[in-house]
A protein has these predicted regions:
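N-terminal active-site beta-alpha-beta segment that forms phosphate/nucleotide-binding
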Residues: 48-113
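Short coil-to-helix leader/linker segments, especially the first N-terminal amphipathic alpha-helix
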Residues: 30-49, 144-149
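N-terminal amphipathic/basic leader segments beginning at the initiator methionine
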Residues: 1-39
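Short amphipathic alpha-helices and their capping/turn segments at secondary-structure boundaries
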Residues: 42-56, 157-166
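Amphipathic alpha-helical segments in well-structured domains
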Residues: 81-85, 118, 191
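Conserved active-site and cofactor/substrate-binding residues in soluble primary-metabolism enzymes
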Residues: 29, 33, 37, 79-83, ...
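A short, gly/pro- and small-residue-rich
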Residues: 183-193
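An acidic, phosphate/nucleotide-engaging active-site surface
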Residues: 110-185
């Protein structure tokens, strides 16, 4: 049987009498106009106000995005995260938002290499944000960049990335369709301690 493993495939033998193959459903049809679909989602989100109405001059905007830790095949460029972030940045610029940071939501995963960040974000975004220090990777063990936001009923301290806590708006670019990924838990695992 052929398995996806890391960046490659491996061929493995499985015992026929103790193995069962479960096939996934057919893939979803591709989106013909990804940029249009992204823009439509930002202008017409489910159960939320359109992004442009939330953007105000002088605000702190933080855009978090998935790291490269999941063993999924690399996307062709442009990566969907790049497309999402470009659309958000365009709307932010139109609204006069200048204080924008990009954070790779690593949680406790390994740091991404610069070439991985460039693959995810594209050269233009990387070159615009990385040299200024406004593109960085969350470090759940860097306590100087964490802030306490409360504690659980059991007394466990809740810490989150300081920039995220201080932001007026946080946008998260998540692109995976796997059962254990995405949604609010991307924040609680990606940019918390």
């Amino acid at each position: 049987m052929l398995f996806w493993r890391g960046e490659n495939f491996s061929l493995e033998r499985l015992p026929a009498d103790r193995s069962r193959v479960i096939y996934p459903p057919e893939p979803l049809a591709g989106i013909e106009d990804p940029e249009g679909a992204i823009r439509n989602a930002l202008l017409n989100p489910m159960d939320a106000d359109p992004l442009p109405t939330l953007l105000k001059p002088g605000m702190k905007l933080t855009i978090c995005f998935d790291d490269a830790s999941l063993s999924l095949p690399k996307m062709r460029r442009p990566d969907t995260r790049q497309r999402i972030i470009e659309a958000v940045l365009e709307m932010a610029a139109e609204a006069g938002v200048d204080d924008v940071h990009l954070i790779a939501a690593l949680g406790l995963h390994r740091r991404m290499h610069d070439y991985e960040l460039k693959h995810v974000l594209g050269d233009r975004i990387f070159d615009a944000f990385h040299p200024r220090g406004t593109l960085y990777q969350h470090d759940a063990e860097d306590y100087d960049n964490l802030t306490v936001i409360g504690e659980t009923e059991e007394g466990e301290v809740l810490e989150i990335n300081k920039r995220v806590a201080e932001s007026d708006l946080v946008v998260y670019a998540n692109v995976n369709q796997v059962a254990m990924d995405g949604g609010w838990k991307s924040i609680t695992t990606g940019v918390a301690s």
